[in-house]
Curated annotation (Swiss-Prot):
The modification Phosphoserine is found at S51. This is Mitochondrial thiamine pyrophosphate carrier. Mitochondrial transporter mediating uptake of thiamine diphosphate into mitochondria. It is not clear if the antiporter activity is affected by the membrane potential or by the proton electrochemical gradient. It comes from the Eukaryota. SUPFAM superfamilies: Mitochondrial carrier. It is found in: Mitochondrion membrane. Its main location: mitochondrion. It is a multi-pass membrane protein. Keywords: Antiport, Membrane, Mitochondrion, Phosphoprotein, Repeat, Transmembrane, Transmembrane helix, Transport. The chain crosses the membrane at residues 19-39, 87-107, 122-142, 173-193, 220-240, 293-313. Belongs to the mitochondrial carrier (TC 2.A.29) family. GO terms for molecular function: antiporter activity; thiamine pyrophosphate transmembrane transporter activity. It comes from Pongo abelii.
Length: 320
């Protein structure tokens, strides 16, 4: 079970083991879902409608976008920005899961609330994600820039990107989109953790005979369901974040269609509504849901898997 478990037979992992499990979970998950992330970002940054009926639209579907990216940029394009993305995932996973475990334990020991309640998991999950976001946000901006650029490349290496961005846009560039990121990540991560816990309880209630026979499958399915629910409810804020993160990077976006500048979160929301309609808030939702189902499912699956491995190692060591 993710989060502090007061039961005597609960996992007894150290904080270091929790951080390692979170890091490895992030690393493996990122490698598997990177292509969906690249397609999602391309959709989010395209101002034209995602439709064949719009002659100016570069992308209009997942398969079409996949073929076009493959033809124009080669298979490595699906892992553009993968190094900063992996740094992001490893750091984010460690901070998020460690913070969540510590916060739920703090709630259990210092309040009257049960650490396993939906509301506790929602608040602790949201706060843990905010802590992780503040830690790794500069890397997220770098990842978005790498994934968003076409050919010819503006940034050749990670060091080149850091130097160019700092000289041309100043240090504040590394925290572009932070406000909508924090606003979006709190409910998104809160829903991930709380829905995951609730879906696991529902699964055990619906299929009590299963017990622990298919626990790994249960973790994967419940994680995927939690990912779809949380992503659907918070998607517009993710779109605003991506649009704001590429501000000042318009020259590299010219090959993808229209280019717009935004003054801030509210201006971005207003322009999207006026020029792209209400459906503009959900551009790229289909690859995002696919990505959310896979990434959240794998995230919880691998985290629980490695925590269980460490728990078994600790138990074996204590019995010697």
């Amino acid at each position: 079970m993710v989060g502090y478990d007061p039961k005597p037979d609960g996992r007894n992992n150290t904080k270091f083991q929790v951080a390692v499990a979170g890091s490895v979970s992030g690393l493996v998950t990122r490698a598997l879902i990177s292509p969906f992330d690249v397609i999602k970002i391309r959709f989010q940054l395209q101002h034209e409608r995602l439709s064949r009926s719009d002659p100016n639209a570069k992308y209009h579907g997942i398969l079409q976008a996949s073929r076009q990216i493959l033809q124009e940029e080669g298979p490595t394009a699906f892992w553009k920005g993968h190094i900063p993305a992996q740094i992001l995932s490893i750091g984010y996973g460690a901070v998020q899961f460690l913070s969540f475990e510590m916060l739920t334990e703090l709630v259990h020991r210092g309040s009257v609330y049960d650490a396993r309640e939906f509301s506790v998991h929602f608040v602790c999950g949201g706060l843990a994600a905010c802590m992780a976001t503040l830690t790794v946000h500069p890397v997220d901006v770098l990842r978005t820039r790498f994934a968003a650029q076409g050919e010819p490349k503006v940034y050749n290496t990670l060091c080149h990107a850091v130097g160019t961005m700092y000289r041309s846009e100043g240090p504040q560039v590394f925290y572009k989109g932070l406000a909508p990121t924090l606003i979006a990540i709190f409910p998104y991560a809160g829903l991930q953790f709380s829905c995951y816990s609730s879906l696991k309880h529902l699964y055990k209630w619906a299929i009590p005979a299963e017990g622990k026979k298919n626990e790994n499958l249960q973790n994967l399915l419940c994680g995927s369901g939690a990912g779809v629910i949380s992503k659907t409810l918070t998607y517009p804020l993710d779109l605003f974040k991506k649009r704001l993160q590429v501000g000042g990077f318009e020259h590299a976006r010219a090959a993808f269609g229209q280019v717009r500048r935004y003054k801030g979160l509210m201006d971005c929301a207003k322009q999207v509504l006026q020029k792209e309609g209400a459906l503009g808030f959900f551009k790229g939702l289909s690859p995002s849901l696919l990505k959310a189902a896979l990434s959240t499912g794998f995230m919880f699956f691998w985290y629980e898997f490695f925590c269980n491995v460490f728990h078994c190692m600790n138990r074996t060591a204590s019995q010697r």
